[in-house]
Curated annotation (Swiss-Prot):
Highest taxon, organism lineage: Bacteria
Protein name: Ribonuclease HIII
Organism: Protochlamydia amoebophila (strain UWE25)
Family: Belongs to the RNase HII family. RnhC subfamily.
Keyword Glycosyltransferase applies: no
Annotated ranges, domain RNase H type-2: 90-301
Catalytic activity: Endonucleolytic cleavage to 5'-phosphomonoester
Sites where the protein binds a divalent metal cation: 96-97, 198
Biological process terms in GO annotation: DNA replication, removal of RNA primer; mismatch repair
Gene it is expressed from: rnhC
EC number: 3.1.26.4
GO CC field: cytoplasm; ribonuclease H2 complex
Keyword field: Cytoplasm, Endonuclease, Hydrolase, Magnesium, Metal-binding, Nuclease
Function text: Endonuclease that specifically degrades the RNA of RNA-DNA hybrids.
Length: 301
C-alpha cells in the first residue's frame, strides 16, 4: 500500500476524454463504477474521475504519475511537485517547438518576446501550454499573440527537414540549430538577451549552437518550461504553424494525415504509398522515423 495520502483535485470535464484516451494508451485498465466517468488502474496506481469533476489519484506510483504526466499534460499546473512556481514578469524571450514527434508534417520552432506590459494581457487571453488547447483555440490565440508580441517562427517542411537531418544526423542537434536561429532573429528584433527554453536535450547542445552563431545569451533551459508565459505563447505559435502545415499537406494529397506516429499514422502512410508512391510519401514525412520502415514493409528485414 502507498504511504502517501490520495491526491485529490478538480478537473474540467472537457478534459475527461483526453485523460481517458491517454490512460488507455498508457496501459491502464478501465472500469466505470457508480458516480464516476471512469476509474483507471494498473500496478501501483489508480486514477478515478467522478461525474462531479473530482479526480482522485492514489497508489505507490502516484508521485511519478502526477509530476511527469498529470500536472504537465492535464492540469497544467505544478502545485504537487513545484508548489512555489511563480510567473516571471521580467521581459524575456520564450522558445518552444512542435512536430518533433510527428511522422507527417513540418518541424516548427517559435519564439515570443514579452515585455512587462504584455504579461497581464496574455494571461487575460488565456495563454497556456498548447498541449491543453484545441486546434481551434490555438489558431485564435496565435492570431492574438502575433498582434500583441514580437515573434519569430522557423518552419522546416519535411523535404527540407530530411535534407538538413542528413547534415546533423541527430534530431537534438537539428532542434538546437532551429532554437538558435529563432533566438538570433528575436534578439535582432527586440534587443533582449534573456531567453527561456523548454529543455529537450543536454544543456550543452543548445549552448554550442548559440556559440556557433556568436550569440551572448542569458539562457535558462528547464523541463516543462511551458509554465512560463513566454514559452507558453511560443508553444502556441509553434503548434499553429505545425497544424497549418499538416493541414496543407493533407489537402495537397487529399488524404487526412494524423498527428503523432501511431498505428493510424501507419495506415495513412500506406494509403499515401498506394495512391502516390514512395517518393511522394518520403516528401511529406520525417524519413528517419521507424514508422517509414513499417509502412514500406521493411521491419525485421
Amino acid at each position: 500500500m502507498s504511504s502517501l495520502p490520495p491526491f485529490v483535485t478538480t478537473l474540467d470535464l472537457k478534459l475527461a476524454e483526453k485523460l481517458l484516451k491517454d490512460l488507455q494508451q498508457q496501459g491502464f485498465s478501465i472500469t466505470i463504477p457508480a458516480y464516476t466517468r471512469f476509474s483507471a488502474s494498473k500496478k501501483g496506481l489508480t486514477c478515478t474521475l467522478y461525474t462531479s469533476g473530482k479526480l482522485v489519484v492514489q497508489g505507490k506510483e502516484q508521485a511519478h504519475f502526477i509530476e511527469f504526466y498529470l500536472e504537465p499534460e492535464i492540469l497544467e499546473s505544478f502545485g504537487f511537485s513545484h508548489p512555489t512556481t511563480k510567473i516571471d514578469l521580467t521581459p524575456h524571450i520564450g522558445i518552444d517547438e512542435s512536430g518533433k514527434g510527428d511522422f507527417f508534417g513540418p518541424l516548427c520552432i517559435a519564439g515570443v518576446y514579452i515585455q512587462a506590459n504584455q504579461f497581464s494581457k496574455l494571461q487575460a487571453l488565456g495563454v497556456k501550454d498548447s498541449k491543453t488547447l484545441s486546434d481551434k483555440t490555438i489558431r485564435q490565440l496565435a492570431s492574438q499573440i502575433k498582434n500583441l508580441c514580437l515573434y519569430h517562427i522557423v518552419k522546416i517542411n519535411p523535404a527540407k527537414y530530411n535534407e538538413i537531418y542528413q547534415d546533423f544526423k541527430n534530431l537534438n542537434h537539428l532542434l538546437a540549430w532551429g532554437h538558435a536561429t529563432t533566438i538570433e532573429q528575436l534578439i535582432l528584433q527586440s534587443g533582449c538577451q534573456t531567453v527561456i527554453v523548454d529543455q529537450f536535450a543536454d544543456e550543452k547542445v543548445v549552448l554550442l549552437a548559440l556559440k556557433r552563431k556568436k550569440l551572448d545569451v542569458n539562457l535558462t533551459q528547464r523541463h516543462r518550461a511551458e509554465d512560463d508565459l513566454a514559452v507558453a505563447a511560443a508553444s502556441i505559435l509553434a503548434r499553429q504553424a505545425f497544424i497549418d502545415g499538416l493541414e496543407q499537406l493533407s489537402k495537397e494529397i487529399q488524404i487526412p494525415l494524423p498527428k503523432g506516429s501511431s498505428s493510424a499514422t501507419q495506415k495513412a502512410g500506406k494509403e499515401v504509398l498506394r495512391k502516390w508512391g514512395e517518393e511522394r510519401l518520403r516528401s511529406i514525412c520525417k524519413q528517419h522515423f521507424k514508422t517509414l520502415d513499417a509502412i514500406l514493409g521493411k521491419v525485421g528485414k
